[in-house]
Amino acid sequence: MKKVCVIGWPVEHSRSPLIHNYWIGLHGIEGAVYERLAVPPDAAAETIRNLGGLGFIGANVTVPHKETAFAALARHDAIAKRLKAVNTIVTTPAGLEGRNTDGYGFIANLKDRAPGWDAKAGPAVLLGAGGAARAIAAALEDEGAPEIRIINRTPSRAEALARDLGLRNALVFADGEAKTALDGAALLVNTTTLGMKGESDVDLDISPLPAPALVTDIVYTPLETRLLRRAREAGYKTVDGLGMLLHQAVPGFEAWFGVRPQVTPELRALVLADMGMK
């Protein structure tokens, strides 16, 4: 039996089991199963270290345990070390290894949904300075973005993010300086939960963005956030956040089962149907 799980608190909302079990069935991997494992914060570190004893060959890690997983594991890939956060755990000959595929998922989604997109085209503007912003900023820099501009209500938090990641060309802006931040940018990314169902919307005038700019959002419920709708109506190219979820799952599945799965229209339709969307 090859068992893998997603660890979180809560974890009932996770669509990782739907994604991975779809791929397991598609590729005919016998004896494999992917399940949810709800783990409270005070038990997370011990559970993560004892994954093998619980019968798991690997795991995904979701909020609020990504930083706990990093601290609990002795081995990490280079990206997890830089981010100090783990979303994928793999069994290696040397033991459990923590990895982070969030940035990979973000970049792969843009390349998939916006063919021809190039990070080198110009500055990238990030709204927010939380955990998702860390992964996305690092990935964009690695992809060749010439400048990372971070807009955050608390500039000191954005400055700490840039310093901690060692970003080479980062600029920080307060909320009131958004017009300057957007001037000449090639990409705008909402890395916050603003715009998600039950949350307030992103309050931002995007008109200073040049016409060729791409606008994307990590939120995928709703699939088209108010930010994306406004951008689309203003003539900008847009990419929704669902693909980031789908693409970040690819490297882990390959590491666990030895097969590299594809993010297809069928998989996207399956997840959208589960979300009550079409």
From Swiss-Prot:
Per UniProt, which keywords does this protein have? Amino-acid biosynthesis, Aromatic amino acid biosynthesis, NADP, Oxidoreductase
The catalytic residues are K66
Top-rank taxon, per record: Bacteria
Assembly behavior: Homodimer.
Q: Which family does it belong to?
A: Belongs to the shikimate dehydrogenase family.
The record's annotation in HAMAP family points to: Shikimate_DH_AroE
Q: Can you say what this protein is called? A: Shikimate dehydrogenase (NADP(+))
Species source reads Parvibaculum lavamentivorans (strain DS-1 / DSM 13023 / NCIMB 13966)
